[in-house]
Amino acid sequence: MGKGAIKEEESEKKRKTWRWPLATLVVVFLAVAVSSRTNSNVGFFFSDRNSCSCSLQKTGKYKGMIEDCCCDYETVDNLNTEVLNPLLQDLVTTPFFRYYKVKLWCDCPFWPDDGMCRLRDCSVCECPENEFPEPFKKPFVPGLPSDDLKCQEGKPQGAVDRTIDNRAFRGWVETKNPWTHDDDTDSGEMSYVNLQLNPERYTGYTGPSARRIWDSIYSENCPKYSSGETCPEKKVLYKLISGLHSSISMHIAADYLLDESRNQWGQNIELMYDRILRHPDRVRNMYFTYLFVLRAVTKATAYLEQAEYDTGNHAEDLKTQSLIKQLLYSPKLQTACPVPFDEAKLWQGQSGPELKQQIQKQFRNISALMDCVGCEKCRLWGKLQVQGLGTALKILFSVGNQDIGDQTLQLQRNEVIALVNLLNRLSESVKMVHDMSPDVERLMEDQIAKVSAKPARLRRIWDLAVSFW
């Protein structure tokens, strides 16, 4: 071997000795650069609210008429933000709408209860008898007898009497709702709950029991209609339950236990995106349910206006009556969306009555399923919102016909409380979608894109490092 070849071999050995350290440094440098760029984008997204990307908040991807309704998305968002949501937020804090009577413990009529959740947030703080309004304790107006199922082993939570005041609630009598499984006729096992002290939020209620509730609702009582379905009646129940489900998920994600050890609560945007925002049909169904319930409230205007919301606190009761009238007679509502949903188009034709009975039975089963929820606070809000939805169905589809045996609307106090609180829950969910969805969707889609790009990015880094060898 000549001297030139020997020198070239020695030079090549020296280059190999520093290629690997240099390649390692390149890998580290590029990985840090990629990580820093990713993290800086996430931080920038949250810190700079005035960036040009925020202009997307004003557009939104939900436009045009809401399916099967009489209003468009932009009108609903503006009306909800400017008028309805502020009114409802004030209304549900008044003494009349703050207290809800509920049977918290009842045997599940379908299967043994085996799904208690693990967090203290599952439990409900009941009202002592001296807290809820005195008029609520007065004798109720006699009404129709009830043959509903009674709990055989449910523990009495408050032993509070049924309370509809003959003077305070003109026309509010004990009456059956053909759409719901009424279990509030046994006063001995009823409790009054302050809804403001028991907010709808994450409770840790998960697992087979929670899944079984929704599986039973969707598979047995509320199957999704086929893509070619033209019968509107068959769509209504599914869309209502889907919209309610989406709203419940929205509230859970918005008030989530992020760190149990530190009792840190906040918004779980990943859950919000995964459960609701990345599914446009769920968002649309939420808007549909909101307008459906809003239509029920406006249709009951004459009844709700004449009722007295007596709690014994004169100033607060006057405020409640004023807020109710502002809600019912809002000029913006009457101008922009006077008929949110047209119920007259349903139940037409020869099969209409039979179809209505079928859907009533399905919704009654859904109502009864709330007794199978293995979490006290989840059961509270499930019962309240399902009763509110059942009240909306009663107002829209059971007035002036044989379903209730009378030509005039009659509501229980608890039905009105549930109806207004449900409307507020849906209003909050719609507002959160409008306010948050552009930012949340953009952030989550960016993160998904970056996670998907990681394998290719690492491969490029490795190829670059190997090229030095």
Swiss-Prot record:
It comes from the Eukaryota. It is an enzyme of class 1 (oxidoreductase). It is a peripheral membrane protein. GO terms for cellular component: endoplasmic reticulum; endoplasmic reticulum membrane. Residues 1-36 form the signal peptide. Keywords: Disulfide bond, Electron transport, Endoplasmic reticulum, FAD, Flavoprotein, Glycoprotein, Membrane, Oxidoreductase, Redox-active center, Signal, Transport. N-glycosylated. SUPFAM superfamilies: ERO1-like. It is found in: Endoplasmic reticulum membrane. Its EC number is 1.8.4.-. Its main location: endoplasmic reticulum. Its cofactor is FAD. Disulfide bonds join 52-71, 54-69, 108-372, 117-122, 222-231, 375-378. InterPro entries: Ero1, ERO1-like_sf. May function both as a monomer and a homodimer. Essential oxidoreductase that oxidizes proteins in the endoplasmic reticulum to produce disulfide bonds. Acts by oxidizing directly PDI isomerase through a direct disulfide exchange. Does not act as a direct oxidant of folding substrate, but relies on PDI to transfer oxidizing equivalent. Does not oxidize all PDI related proteins, suggesting that it can discriminate between PDI and related proteins. Its reoxidation probably involves electron transfer to molecular oxygen via FAD. Acts independently of glutathione. Belongs to the EROs family. This is Endoplasmic reticulum oxidoreductin-1. It comes from Arabidopsis thaliana. The gene is AERO1.
